UniProtKB/Swiss-Prot annotation:
Any coiled-coil regions, as ranges: none
Keyword set, alphabetical order: ANK repeat
First and last residues of every ANK repeat: 82-115
Provenance organism: Rickettsia felis (strain ATCC VR-1525 / URRWXCal2) (Rickettsia azadi)
Protein name: Putative ankyrin repeat protein RF_1158
S-S bridge residues: none
Top-rank lineage group of the source organism: Bacteria
Length: 148
């Protein structure tokens, strides 16, 4: 879209609050920018968890921009080599109890982390999770069969 008249027309439509079409060149660029912003937010959220930055974690969670149970699809390779949730990363790193308790209090699902630890045969992670989330003890027998 290099035609100045088309660009001017588009600007006028946008200024009037009309004409947003996600399939148009500008619309698709805006949609792509939103997707990249979301990806950056998720990567930053996991970075905050890895660095134990509780204030930054709170910022992401309180703004509601992040699903607290989203999986990190690009593992950093520091501790885990498989995708896992923020809670799984926090536990695997031996993160501060304050961070772990905050994640749990704000909806982090311990069963997801438990399943991730089971898949990677991370017994230390499983045991740590059971200490932190005692309700997981009831699930322990079912999930401890690591051959399934």
């Amino acid at each position: 879209m290099n035609d100045p008249k088309q660009i001017e027309k588009l600007y006028k439509l946008i200024a009037a609050g009309e004409g947003f079409n996600p399939n148009s060149p500008l619309g698709s660029m805006m949609v792509e920018t939103q997707a990249l912003t979301k990806k950056f937010a998720v990567i930053s959220f996991f970075g905050a968890v890895e660095k134990r930055e509780l204030d930054m974690i709170k910022t992401f969670v309180e703004k509601g921009e992040i699903d607290i149970n989203v999986k990190n699809l690009v593992p950093q390779g520091l501790i885990l080599t498989r995708p896992t949730t923020a809670l799984g990363i926090a536990i695997a790193q031996g993160n501060s109890e304050e961070v772990i308790k905050y994640l749990l209090a704000n909806g982090a699902d311990p069963k997801l982390a438990f399943d991730d630890f089971k898949k990677s045969a991370n017994i230390d992670g499983i045991n740590q999770l059971i200490k932190i989330a005692p309700d997981m003890i009831a699930c322990r027998k079912k999930y401890m069969n690591l051959n399934n």
